[in-house]
Amino acid sequence: MRRVSVLCLALLPLLGTAPAHAGSGTASATVFAPNPVATLQDESLTDQKDADYPALQKAYRTVTLTHLDGSGYLHGDYAWVDTSTGPLATAPFTYHRDDDRFEQVMAYYWATQAQLYLQELGFTNVNNEPQQMKIGQYGVDNSYYNGDHSHDVLRFGKGGVDDAEDAEVILHEYGHAIQDSQVPGFGTTADSGAIGEGFGDYWAQAVSTRYAPTPDEPCIADWDSTSYTPGPVHCLRRTDGTKVYPRDLVGEVHADGEIWSSALNGMRNALGATKADTAIVKAQFSFTVDITMPAAARVTIATVQSLYGSKAASAATAAFHARGLA
């Protein structure tokens, strides 16, 4: 979930080659939606070394995996899952968290949902590919997007709550793939890197809310963060903060990204989810790899103006102004 890493562009060992479009098979599966803490509203839940203990049972959901290629593996139109920790998951995809293959199912389902939401918003050619994902990266408790354009991969770590057990960690990383699809190499400076982290958090909120709404939507990665936050409420980060640009910049892209995510969330509250999400994604086509937050705010406001008119643009301006960006 990029707690400490920056965008990694190193060349890494290649996974199996994924076709451009694999198929449209379906299968029943068991997942968290989005995670046990958010679903059950229980901040006392902890990892307990991957134990599938009784308090977690009501957090599981049965879903339908779509766009599978019929191979029996988690390979499909929009997601292509590999692992460094044991066998590949095969049907039936009804694992629980005490089996590492559960995380593979989570990755496939939520990456597919992220792409389907993009298409629902009208974006049919943004990261529209079998997004490669590898679970259990080196046993390290960190996840990240590797943006090597010959072979871009989302990699999910282990330790504490394994990262791919939390849908919002998966969706955050998918957010980086979205931006890299729109603006190759995006995030080369402090500000643009913070925009990347902020959008990743916002995208996690947007997609998890679309498919599995919970009461505290701005709290990102409630489950994964139980392993490294003191509580009483566990959040990796929030999208409803009060940080202001440039006063509250600290020079760390994840922390500074809360300025951007909170501006986007303010716009969402003003315009509604569909209008805000459409404008936010569309605006990113006009970003540069090194754009500043104020410049990105101006581009986003102009996009709102072009899509929805002056009243909506004024509401978007107010959301960015509250964060010092307009």
Predicted segments with their positions:
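Hydrophobic core
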Residues: 9-17
